[in-house]
Amino acid sequence: MSAIALGMIIFAYLCGSISSAVLVCRVAKLPDPREHGSGNPGATNVLRIGGRTAAATVLIFDVLKGMLPVWIAYLLHVSPLYLGLTAIAACLGHIYPVFFHFKGGKGVATAFGAIAPIGWDLTGLMTGTWLLTVLLSGYSSLGAIISALIAPFYVWWFKPQFTFPVAMLSCLILMRHHDNIQRLWRGKESKIWDKLRKKKQKTPAEEAAELEEKEED
């Protein structure tokens, strides 16, 4: 491994460790996403507790912190294997952030940003897959799961040299969605457009019930 490749992997992990959900909520004086809603510091949970603007800001920053290190590594002609490890490092930083006691999100937006530099055709397919799944089902988590399952096949078709690293990345995303898969199977997963409705209508009793359900999970 060259010094440049090692440096990019470390840089990617540190970029991923910047929890935009926590920082945006602090700036906007919103509740800590690690302690409210689903407890996941990501854009979907910020949508629940803070609304669309805060969620969109988190989403953009989460995508960029995956995209930036991989793009720089790509421009520095890092080999495909280490380029893939750079992408994985960014996602690991998001999931286990060194700056936030290793309690992070699920890495979907960061993984999407990390895959984007491979090609815009692939990016378009991934976006379309996620959007179509969410529009048909209403479940953001299902969109992420389906996209993670299909991503290695898309990459194999367009850029086969990146198939193995992207497959590893997909496995990481699927592992982080273990609880969501169980809730989907039991029919207890909440739909994405229900989140704003719940934010407006939720009573203290409902919040207590949601917290109890979360503890049972």
Swiss-Prot record:
One biological process GO term for this chain? phospholipid biosynthetic process
The membrane topology term of the UniProt record is:
Multi-pass membrane protein
The reaction(s) annotated as catalysed by this protein in its Swiss-Prot or TrEMBL entry are:
an acyl phosphate + sn-glycerol 3-phosphate = a 1-acyl-sn-glycero-3-phosphate + phosphate
Q: Pathway, per Swiss-Prot/TrEMBL? A: Lipid metabolism; phospholipid metabolism
Q: Membrane-spanning residues where?
A: 4-24, 54-76, 80-102, 112-132, 138-158
Family per record: Belongs to the PlsY family.
HAMAP family from the UniProt entry: PlsY
Q: Describe the subunit structure.
A: Probably interacts with PlsX.
The name of this protein is Glycerol-3-phosphate acyltransferase
The species is: Yersinia enterocolitica serotype O:8 / biotype 1B (strain NCTC 13174 / 8081)
Q: What is the lineage of its organism?
A: Bacteria, Pseudomonadati, Pseudomonadota, Gammaproteobacteria, Enterobacterales
**Gene behind this protein:** plsY
